[in-house]
Curated annotation (Swiss-Prot):
Function text: Probable transcription repressor involved leaf development. Binds to the DNA sequence 5'-CAAT[GC]ATTG-3'. May act as a regulatory switch to specify provascular cell fate.
Bias kind Low complexity: ranges: 119-145
Induction of expression: By auxin and sucrose in primary root apical region. By wounding in leaves.
Name by which UniProt lists this protein: Homeobox-leucine zipper protein HOX1
PROSITE patterns: HOMEOBOX_1 (PS00027), HOMEOBOX_2 (PS50071)
Species annotation: Oryza sativa subsp. japonica (Rice)
Length: 311
């Protein structure tokens, strides 16, 4: 048994790697045709008429039906020797360590059986996929970390001011709503802030002030608009009343005093020249009425005798 394993190992690591091993199986009950039968697979029960024998260097030994452990080892060795293409390549195992172990002490068939199981194609594929997936996971983690750093660095933190700092800034803003670089630097040193923070605070404060002023102007304009709307409605009502009164007066005026085409006195208009002539005539009439009346000469009445004689 040991000779068979050593022979297989020597041929495998000697460069041939033909998958050939030194083994001897004799059939006691069978003939030459039985010897040409393929070796049994792992886990398959051997025929009851056949007995497997191995060479241990000193002579032949036969495995009885009770020696199940030896028969299992022999079948495992045959499987490993004659079917090397079913084994997978274990990329996680260094060949130097395997060579050292082989030269120091030849492994048994049970160890040889466990190693191919450990390095099966499934395990090889899983190990390869794990190795390929590890860099991608590491890359994803690094990208997430860089994104977090970028987002953290790009996001601005809100400035938290104390009551004293806010009061000083408000007083300064009431005096000057804008600051030159020297005033900005001095105020930043006084408040233990950065000049950029002071500048941003003043910008926000000016924006809030402008917004409040805009709201106030909007309210004022809204009130003015409402007032003008009410005044316009009142004027419309008065105009309607005057038109109704005019129509009523024109309907009640006597038509025999005025011609059909003569408008009523309330709507009579005169040109400037006629107006001057009318005013001059009125003035002359007033002056003549104010002058003293002339005395009218009268004759004395005749005596009564003359009147009687004539009669």
């Amino acid at each position: 048994m040991e000779m068979m394993v050593h022979g297989r190992r020597d041929e495998q690591y000697g460069g041939l790697r033909l998958g050939l091993g030194l083994g001897l199986s004799l059939g006691v009950a069978g003939g030459a045709a039985d010897d040409e039968q393929p070796p049994p697979r792992r886990g398959a029960a051997p025929p009851p008429q056949q007995q497997l024998c191995g060479w241990n260097g000193g002579g032949l030994f036969s495995s009885s039906s009770s020696d199940h452990r030896g028969r299992s080892a022999m079948m495992a060795c045959h499987d490993v020797i004659e079917m090397p293409f079913l084994r997978g390549i274990d990329v996680n195992r260094a060949p130097a360590a395997e060579t050292t172990t082989t030269t120091a002490r030849g492994p048994s068939c049970s160890e040889e059986d466990e190693e191919p199981g450990a390095s099966s194609p499934n395990s090889t594929l899983s190990s390869l996929s794990g190795k390929r997936g590890a860099p991608s996971a590491a890359t994803a983690a690094a990208a997430a970390a860089s994104d977090d750093e970028d987002s953290g660095g790009g996001s601005r933190k809100k400035l938290r001011l104390s009551k004293d700092q806010a009061a000083v800034l408000e007083d300064t803003f009431k005096e000057h709503n804008t600051l030159n670089p020297k005033q900005k630097a001095a105020l930043a040193r006084q408040l233990n802030l950065k000049p950029r923070q002071v500048e941003v605070w003043f910008q926000n404060r000016r924006a809030r002030t402008k917004l409040k002023q805009t709201e106030v102007d909007c309210e004022l304009l809204k009130r003015c608009c409402e007032t003008l709307t009410d005044e316009n409605r009142r004027l419309h009502r008065e105009l309607q009343e005057l038109r109704a009164l005019k129509l009523a007066t024109a309907a009640a005026a006597p038509h025999h005093l005025y011609g059909a085409r003569v408008p009523p006195p309330t709507t009579l208009t005169m040109c400037p020249s006629c107006e001057r002539v009318a005013s001059a005539a009125t003035t002359t009439r007033n002056n003549s009425g104010a002058a003293p009346a002339r005395p009218v000469p009268t004759r004395p009445w005749p005596p009564a005798a003359a009147q009687r004689s004539s009669a």
